[in-house]
A protein has these predicted regions:
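General marker for long, soluble alpha-helical cores
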Residues: 14-220
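Sec-dependent N-terminal signal peptides
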Residues: 2-13
Length: 220
């Protein structure tokens, strides 16, 4: 019994030391202590810890007052919790993926909602593409595309079965259209119409359908 209790404690101490090592010399001691506490608790709940550590380092590098850095780290934890909840509502398997949670938190920070996260999670796309979709959605909102147009564009692209590379190209394509004089919303709407047309035509070759049977050899 004592051994079974000692193992989690040993892992906890090792994790805390690892976090402390990453922060050593980069943040003040009080920020390091709070970051270690928040990150250790987050890890115990299956949340990623890198966003918390990065926020501590970023704030300290900018000489932000300690109380503001602490508030920012707590907000990161809140966003990670909300992202995990949204993923859980849409696809329970994704809620255990720390990369997906971090991507969801990024999208929430940009201005999407927990419901939006759930919608993307249940799109039916492979997990890796959902993660890309979350990051692209957050980037689009940060570029000024309204959340509703962002969701229409990203979900439409996912449902059309387009590859991850095309998802990653969406922010650049929106910026290119904006440079021609349209608004971010108009640019996204135009791209969404193209994605919807692709969805009606079906997935591109090699996606969403079984490979063709090989031609049988001729009879001797």
């Amino acid at each position: 019994m004592l051994t079974s209790l000692a193992l989690p404690l040993a892992l906890l101490l090792t994790q805390q030391q690892s976090i402390a090592d990453r922060l050593a010399g980069r943040v003040p001691p009080d920020i390091a202590a709070l970051a270690t506490e928040l990150a250790t608790d987050a890890a115990g709940r299956g949340l990623p810890i890198d966003p918390i550590i990065q926020k501590a380092i970023e704030g300290s590098a900018k000489r932000v007052p300690a109380e503001r850095v602490g508030a920012a780290m707590r907000l990161v934890v809140t966003q990670l919790d909300a992202a995990a909840g949204g993923l859980r509502d849409g696809n329970a398997a994704l809620s255990a993926d720390t990369v997906a949670i971090a991507a969801g938190a990024f999208a929430l920070t940009a201005g999407l909602s927990g419901r939006d996260i759930a919608t993307l999670a249940r799109s039916g796309s492979p997990p890796a593409e959902v993660i890309v979709g979350l990051r692209v959605a957050g980037t689009l909102v940060a570029l000024g595309v309204p959340a509703s147009e962002t969701m229409t564009l990203v979900t439409g692209t996912l449902q059309a079965g387009r590859p991850a590379g095309e998802l990653l190209a969406l922010p650049g394509r929106v910026q290119a259209e904006v440079a021609k004089g349209v608004t971010p919303a108009q640019a996204a709407a135009g791209l969404a119409r193209a994605a919807a047309a692709q969805a009606r035509r079906g997935p591109p070759p090699g996606r969403g359908q079984p490979p063709p049977h090989p031609t049988p050899p001729p009879h001797p």
